Amino acid sequence: MASSENKRELILTRSPGRLMVSLSLPAIVGMVVIGLYTFVDAIYAGQLIGVDAMGAVSIAYPFTFINSGLAAMIGMGSASVLSRAIGARDQKSIDQVMGNLVVMNLVLSLAVTVVGVAFARPLLALTGAEGAMLDLGECYLRIIFLGSLFVNFAQSSNMIMRGEGELASAMGIMAGGAILNMVLAPVFILALRDQGLGLEGAACATVLSQAVLAGVMLWWFVKREKTARIVRVAASRAVLAEVAKVGVSAMLMQVLTLVQQAIIYRAAAEWGGAEWQVLFGAALRIQSFAFIPLWGMSNGFQPAAGTNYGAGLYDRVRRCTVAFSLGATGLALLFWIPAMLFPEAALSLFITDPALVAQGVDDFRVFFVAYLAMGVMVMGITLFQSLGKGGLAALLALARPLLLFVPLVLIVPNLGGLGIHGVWLACAITDGLLALIAVALMVRTCRGMWKGRARTAAIEEGEAARA
């Protein structure tokens, strides 16, 4: 407990800039390695199997957000409860966090496995996929859904480690699982490729590495003497409700990304055909990977914002918000510049046909141009989650795939004969508008905290004067 107290004091006293580096750097490095899970699967599929396999992994990828969404809801919600409880020294809530997490994982993962395996093909058909791409995607996705419990428990419990401030250990464990997958995937693909099961081999490698990772996380919370431990597997209604309230926005962000990407693939099929689905598959993989460092920084921001807010240090919350938002924008710049300068090289990671790559270069630049503003958007969602303001976080989560993108993708391709090029443009406009909304909500929230602090100080001064 002494080490937990020391970490709490560092979060409450260290300068925001230094805090950003110390909390975020391990998370960024670890999550980049973690992101190589699906990124490498797509590269291996395209380079070792073929274009149809690359397309199959791409259309299946959005549906993996079902598990990512559940893990995010359970993990981010629980981590928010934990960090605020640590800040407020609420030991009862701290002791209940892991029991709730285990129960939620067991129930929700079982449901996803049953439904996902049964309805994998109809789900994939929603993207407009046909023929070999649909058949391969179905086999791949069913195997991924069979590993739901492993990936959900591993990811959500890892978020608890981060909520405790154990960022280096959390990222090291997740990175180990990702490296295992990168080693196993080509071995399984090459071993099964001649039997026509190369893509199934990639899926099996992913599930096996996630199972190992889940076992390590279980050992950590059962055997290690940490702030949050698995002592009693039971659900507390109060903690469960708070986890759901805060975590639903994290789940919405993931699940509605599924909706957005499914709509993109459907629009690509209608306006362009299978080749444009493959191009969008490569572009979305690159964008998703570029988002990962931003979410890594958000993992450092979450305990900083939540712990300071729980301790009533509202000015530090504001200063940390500014520091992390600037840092996230700088981080986004590191990905934005190469994407703008070398789009051919980026697309060629997944696509071996030079003519197809050349076909998508200009549209890829348009698609990626608004990514530069996404760091602020991610910090905004994390801020609202950390403060327990699930409604604002949910608003941002809903805005991107539904409130903004759906009307734009219906309108823009029909303007001036843009067609398929309008689908790419609709994605960029959506992200630009979302960043503006996030900034406005963050400014309003920080001003509200400042005014609330001023009112509290005035009341306390008045009571002191009367006494």
What is each of the regions a protein language model found here?
Residues M1-S24, L82-L149, L180-V183, V187-V248, ...:
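Short alpha-helical transmembrane segments in multi-pass integral membrane proteins
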Residues I11-I49, P62-G77, V81, L106-T113, ...:
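N-terminal transmembrane alpha-helices
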Residues S22-D41, I143, G177, S209-L213, ...:
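Transmembrane helical elements of multi-pass membrane transporters/channels
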Residues L36-M54, L124-G131, V187-L197, V255-R285, ...:
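Helix-terminus/linker motif at the lipid-water interface of multi-pass membrane proteins
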Residues F39-A42, V114, P122, S156-I160, ...:
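Alpha-helical transmembrane segments of multipass membrane proteins
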Residues A45-F65, G131-L136, L199-C204, V239-V246, ...:
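Interfacial/gating helices of multi-pass transporter permease domains
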Residues M54-V114, V151-A170, L279-I337, L341-P343, ...:
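Small-residue-rich hydrophobic transmembrane alpha-helices
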Residues G75, I144-R162, A170-A178, A202-M217, ...:
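Short runs within selected transmembrane alpha-helices of multi-pass transporters and secretion channels
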